[in-house]
Amino acid sequence: MSFSISLSFPDGSQRDFPAEITGLELAESISKSLAKKAIAYSLNGVIRDLLDPLEQSGQVEIITRDDPRALQLIRHSCAHVLAEAVQELFPETQVTIGPVIENGFYYDFARQQPFTLEDLNTIEKKMREIIQRNKFFKKEIWSREKAKKIFSDKGELYKVELIDAIPEDQDLKIYYQGDWFDLCRGPHVPSTGQIGNAFKLMKVAGAYWRGDANNPMLTRIYGTAFSNENALKAYLNMLEEAEKRDHRRLGREMDLFHFQEEGPGMIFWHPKGWKMFQNLVSYMRRRLDEHKYDEVNAPQVLDKSLWETSGHWGWYQENMFKTIPATNDWNDEHVYALKPMNCPGHVQIFKHGLKSYRDLPIRLAEFGLLHRYEPSGSLHGLMRVRSFTQDDAHVFCTDEQLADECLKINDLILSTYADFGFEEIILKLSTRPEKRVGSDELWDHAENIMMSVLKTIEKEAKGRIKTSILQGEGAFYGPKFEYTLKDAIGREWQCGTTQVDFNLPERFEVFYINRDSEKCQPVMIHRAIFGSMERFLGILIENFAGHMPLWLAPQQIVVTTITSEANEYAEKITAKLKASGLSAVSDLRSEKINYKIREHSLQKVPVILVCGKRESETNSVNMRRLGSMNQISLPIDQAIKQLTNEAIPPDLRRFMNS
């Protein structure tokens, strides 16, 4: 057999192998122990079934169970076992789709009677039985006609619809596990036994076919799977902790906000919640001023002609809230929409008046109230809403200023996250997608600048930031940075973005006058730090489990009395606290002190000052911190000084110490 392909390995070595060698044969040629551990291989970055032949030269890696990439294979294969288990137990059920998602997988089923939570235990037991059979995953390529006939004969009409949607030039792959089979792109682990037992079915939910409310309602079963029992246990423990921190529950207990049916995805902010929101806005306003941004405000409602120019009307219209004057109809040219994004408005502000290169960079920021029509099933407290405020900014600069502006934005983003206690940051650079605007030369230039910025950030971060490059994941209008932070229980939240835009300046014919007195198109940078202010507040509530830092807390201090004899003294203390700039209220109710302390603790008030007859006579207070059983007796002036210092926001503290 001739040696016709050359393979490069992670250790830098390179060897020739016979064409059509399988991944398993390749692993066996390296070592028997590796072959036993192997579950798939990667060729030039594409993960493939272990028994697939290698038809071309390139970079190759054998993937074992411990490889992070193995998790997707395990979960994908587990979804297939779930579908087989359901059809063994409930033969009348049609299977539809079963993708891998973040932290697990799901499968959608069509049946007259939806599954119940009680059914999950039965299904999970059957799954373990199927895994124990250790049947091989076997791939076949079928013709379109054969696939449609077989699935039609089985009554799997959703599969027939999926087959019709697959492009003619793509193979139809069918994966068998024993006698059961499914339409699937793959890849999978070699056999059901290699899924292991570290999996669990989590919940049942309803889902419309293809996410369209006009289609039939299906029953979705969610599950998760890991490479080992310890990882599964850690994940389930994290979920248990996350439930305790759920911002929706804490929002009720702390009396921050609520939702109701008349305004789905729209937040009703209560006084305490709105105070916390405004504290966040005030913090960011100071940071914007520090970094030389100009705050602006653009209209909420704009004519569709503007959205047509920006491109939103063509590709985002279904997510926009539209309106017309009472005298008009939908066919009239004067159709309006609530803005889903701030950028077109900021472009109009930049265009108003002639700009010179001497004026650049111009940094326009807005706490813009946006409206986006999200599907009702996707709404989730503050994390996914239909009306939200974005801490949006757009920087208009010259090409020469791009790198420096990206670095300045990075400094602002990282220092902001640090102020809220987020020290573990993941930064991803997303490069050109297949469908994009702009020439290759333009993309080459922008990506080279962003790559240079990334290297500078890595050097200055000194290990604080993990970085990666996502090939082909950029926006159609330019490359972008995405900032992801880790919270107190290890969850990742994508928040900040820095995006270069070639599209809008060209669409709106934006220009400035350069040194040669010629019109020149500026570089436009989209930038957000919190992203959605509401979502970031939800993240903070969960990260701190409601124990907000004193400077951010909506109600910082409660002064409560033991007896009515101390009422006048308590009100005097409250007035002094307010005069010092602190948020304080008096609780003079004739309730037992332990009852009042418990109530305020449930509402997550950071500091409770207890006053009785002795405190009023000694001009002191008993200070109790949230989460602590200890009380400290302090003179009132000392307590106020201590709390006033503690309540200084981190950005102001930096300024005072500089």
From Swiss-Prot:
Signal peptide start and end residues: none
Cofactor: Zn(2+)
One GO CC term, this protein: cytosol
Compartments reported by the entry: Cytoplasm
Cofactor annotation comment: Binds 1 zinc ion per subunit.
CDD domains attached to this UniProt entry: TGS_ThrRS, ThrRS_anticodon, ThrRS_core
Record key words, sorted: Aminoacyl-tRNA synthetase, ATP-binding, Cytoplasm, Ligase, Metal-binding, Nucleotide-binding, Protein biosynthesis, RNA-binding, tRNA-binding, Zinc
KW Phosphoprotein (keyword) present: no
InterPro entries membership: aa-tRNA-synt_IIb (IPR002314), aa-tRNA-synth_II (IPR006195), aa-tRNA-synth_II/BPL/LPL (IPR045864), Anticodon-bd (IPR004154), Anticodon-bd_dom_sf (IPR036621), Beta-grasp_dom_sf (IPR012675), TGS (IPR004095), TGS-like (IPR012676)
Family to which this protein belongs: Belongs to the class-II aminoacyl-tRNA synthetase family.
Protein name: Threonine--tRNA ligase
